[in-house]
UniProtKB/Swiss-Prot annotation:
The chain crosses the membrane at residues 99-119, 173-193, 207-227, 380-400. Residues 272-299 form the 4Fe-4S ferredoxin-type domain. Keywords: 4Fe-4S, Cell membrane, Electron transport, Iron, Iron-sulfur, Membrane, Metal-binding, Nitrogen fixation, Plasmid, Transmembrane, Transmembrane helix, Transport. It is a multi-pass membrane protein. This is Nitrogen fixation protein FixG. FixG is predicted to be involved in a redox process. The four proteins FixG, FixH, FixI, and FixS may participate in a membrane-bound complex coupling the FixI cation pump with a redox process catalyzed by FixG. Gene3D superfamilies: Alpha-helical ferredoxin, Immunoglobulins. Coiled coil: none annotated. GO terms for cellular component: plasma membrane. It comes from Rhizobium meliloti (strain 1021). Pfam families: Fer4_18, Fer4_5, FixG_C. Disulfide bonds: none annotated.
Length: 524
C-alpha cells in the first residue's frame, strides 16, 4: 500500500471561486466580478516585493538624481529635453540625428521580452510589468486600510456606515495621491525636476504639465485601482503574443495533477477506506491568492500572469501537511506530459499516485523534475545572441562616435555666381555640431582644387584655405561659406573638394565631399 505522509495540521477550505470557470460564465458583457486576493507569504511574494520596491524607486527617484555635466549642460541625470532636442542619460548625450541609438534600445527591449518569455514564460507580466507593479502597490494600500481578504469582502458586502465611508474615502484618496505622484514623476523626466516642482506648486507651470499629470493620474487610478486584472485580460495584447512564443520547454506555472489528483478533503479517511487520493486537499488557497481570480488547477489559461503566488500558497499548505513542496510549481510542458504519462500508465488509466511514488511515499526515479539547464536551449541562446549583438553594437557606437559633426548644404539658387574677373563662386550652408558641453575652437579647411579659396562670412579670412572658428558648447553653429575658383582653373572642379572640420586639441574630425558647380557645359 502507498505510504501516506503524516498530517501535521488541518487545512481549512477557503471560500474562493474563479472568475473564468465555465459554471459562472455569463454574457459577453457581464458586469465585472470583484476579486479580493488574499495576501500570500513565501519566496515568490518576497521577490515580488523586491521588484516592486526597486522599480518604483527607480521610477519616482530617478528625475531627482543630479549629474554634473559642466556649466553649459543640464545637471539632471536622466532628462528628455524636447526644447533642445536632446536626451541625457548620465554620461550619455543623444542628439536628434543619433536617434538610432534609441531605436536600438527598443530593439533590445523587444528581443529581451522574447528572451524572457522563451526562457521563463510570462515573468515580465508577473513581476515587472507596470500594471502588475502598480496593482500590487494599490493592494498594499487597500489591505492596510480595509484588512485582508475576508475583512475586505465583509466590508464590501456590508451596508454603508461611517466606518465604511471613512475607509473607502481614505483608500481612494491615497490611490489618487499615488496617481498624482505617478503623473508628476513622468513629467519630471522632461524638465528640470526641482524647477518644475516649484512651478507646479506656485501654479505657474505650463498647461501641458497639468494636463499630463491629470491624464496619468486618471489612468493610474482607473487601471491600478478599479480595472486591475481586466487590463491584463482584455486590453493588453501581450498575453496573445506570448502564447505564440511559448513552447514545450518554456517555464510556466503548472498544477501537477499527476501527484495532486484525485483531490480529497479527507485524505486519512479515504486512505483508510482503500481509496486512491492525491496531494491536493482542495483548500482553494491557490484561488484565494490569485490576483487574476483564476484556478491554476484548471490548466494553462490566458489570464495567468505567472506571478507564482499560487505556488507560495500551495507550498505553505504542503508544509502544514508534511508533504513535499511543488504541487504547484514552475515546470515545462514536456516534463508535465512525461509525468502525466507515468501517472496514467501512458494515458490508458486514471491518475494513480502510486505510479509516481514508491511504497515509502517518495517520488520514483522516473519522475521528471525541473532542470534549469533547459533554460539554455538553442532557441533561448539565439534570442540572447541577437540581444547581445545589438547591445554590443550600441556600446561600440557610443564609445567610437565623434562628438564633432559637419553638415553641408549647397546653395540651390543661385548654384553659382560668375564674378567680374571671370572667377566662379559657390555658396554653402555649413553647420558645425559641437556635441560636448565645452567650448571648442574648430579648424575649417578646404582640401582639393588647389587654386580655390574659401571665405566664411563674419569670420577672419585666414590664409584662404583654412579658417579658425570658435563654437559654443553643446550647440549647432551655422556658417555661410563661399568657395571661389579663378578663371582658367576650372578643370580642377572635376574632382570637387573636401571640407574638413577638425578640433586640433582632440584630433576629432569630420569630412564632407562637396561638388563645385560651373556655368555652361562645364557645370555638373
Amino acid at each position: 500500500m502507498l505510504h501516506q505522509p503524516k498530517t501535521k495540521a488541518t487545512v481549512g477550505r477557503l471560500d474562493a471561486e474563479t472568475v473564468n470557470a465555465a459554471r459562472v460564465r455569463g454574457p459577453l458583457y457581464e458586469k465585472r466580478r470583484k476579486i479580493f486576493p488574499k495576501r500570500a507569504e513565501g519566496r515568490f511574494r518576497r521577490f515580488k516585493w523586491l521588484v516592486m520596491l526597486v522599480t518604483l524607486g527607480i521610477y519616482y527617484l530617478t528625475p531627482w538624481i543630479r549629474w554634473d555635466r559642466g556649466a553649459h549642460a543640464p545637471d539632471q541625470a536622466v532628462l528628455i529635453d524636447l526644447a533642445s532636442r536632446r536626451f541625457y542619460f548620465f554620461f550619455i548625450e543623444i542628439w536628434p540625428q543619433e536617434f538610432f541609438f534609441v531605436a536600438g534600445l527598443l530593439v533590445m527591449a523587444g528581443f529581451g521580452l522574447f528572451l524572457v518569455t522563451s526562457a521563463v514564460g510570462r515573468a515580465w507580466c508577473g513581476y515587472a510589468c507596470p500594471q502588475t507593479v502598480w496593482v500590487d502597490l494599490f493592494l498594499v494600500v487597500e489591505r492596510f486600510i480595509e484588512g485582508d481578504r475576508n475583512a475586505r469582502m465583509r466590508l464590501d458586502a456590508g451596508p454603508w456606515s461611517l466606518d465604511k465611508i471613512r475607509k473607502r474615502v481614505a483608500k481612494h484618496a491615497i490611490w489618487v495621491a499615488i496617481g498624482v505622484a505617478t503623473g508628476g514623476a513622468w513629467i519630471f523626466y522632461f524638465a528640470d525636476a526641482p524647477s518644475l516642482m516649484s512651478s507646479l506648486v506656485a501654479l505657474d507651470a505650463p498647461p501641458v504639465a497639468y494636463t499630463t499629470i491629470g491624464i496619468l493620474t486618471a489612468t493610474t487610478y482607473v487601471f491600478g485601482g478599479l480595472m486591475r486584472e481586466q487590463v491584463c485580460t482584455y486590453m493588453c495584447p501581450w498575453p496573445r503574443i506570448q502564447a505564440a512564443m511559448l513552447d514545450e520547454n518554456s517555464l510556466v506555472v503548472t498544477y501537477n495533477d499527476w501527484r495532486g489528483e484525485p483531490r480529497s478533503r479527507h485524505a486519512k479517511k479515504a486512505a483508510a477506506a482503500g481509496e486512491v487520493v492525491g496531494d491536493c486537499v482542495d483548500c482553494n488557497a491557490c484561488v484565494a491568492v490569485c490576483p487574476m481570480g483564476i484556478d491554476i488547477r484548471d490548466g494553462q489559461q490566458l489570464e495567468c500572469i505567472t506571478c507564482a503566488l499560487c505556488i507560495d500558497a500551495c507550498d505553505g499548505v504542503m508544509d502544514k501537511l508534511g508533504r513535499e513542496r511543488g504541487l504547484i510549481s514552475y515546470a515545462t510542458l514536456s516534463d508535465y506530459a512525461a509525468n502525466m504519462a507515468l501517472a496514467t500508465s501512458g494515458g490508458t488509466a486514471a491518475i494513480d499516485p502510486s505510479r509516481v511514488r514508491n511504497a515509502h511515499g517518495a517520488f520514483r526515479d522516473k519522475v521528471r523534475h525541473l532542470n534549469w539547464r533547459i533554460v539554455f536551449r538553442p532557441r533561448v541562446l539565439v534570442y540572447f545572441g541577437v540581444w547581445a549583438t545589438v547591445g554590443f553594437g550600441l556600446l561600440f557606437g557610443l564609445l567610437a562616435r565623434d562628438r564633432l559633426e559637419l553638415n553641408v548644404l549647397h546653395d540651390r539658387n543661385p548654384q553659382f555666381v560668375v564674378e567680374s574677373d571671370g572667377s566662379v563662386r559657390n555658396g554653402y550652408m555649413v553647420k558645425l555640431l559641437n556635441m560636448i558641453p565645452e567650448q571648442r575652437t574648430i579648424s575649417l579647411t578646404i582640401e582639393g582644387m588647389p587654386a580655390a579659396t574659401m571665405r566664411v562670412a563674419g569670420q577672419a579670412t585666414g590664409d584662404g584655405r583654412r579658417v579658425t572658428i570658435g563654437v559654443e558648447p553643446d550647440k549647432v553653429t551655422p556658417l555661410k561659406v563661399f568657395v571661389t575658383l579663378p578663371k582658367g582653373r576650372f578643370a580642377e572642379a572635376e574632382e570637387g573638394f573636401s571640407l574638413i572640420a577638425e578640433d586640433p586639441s582632440s584630433h576629432e574630425r569630420d569630412v564632407y565631399q562637396a561638388n563645385f558647380n560651373l556655368p555652361g557645359a562645364a557645370g555638373r
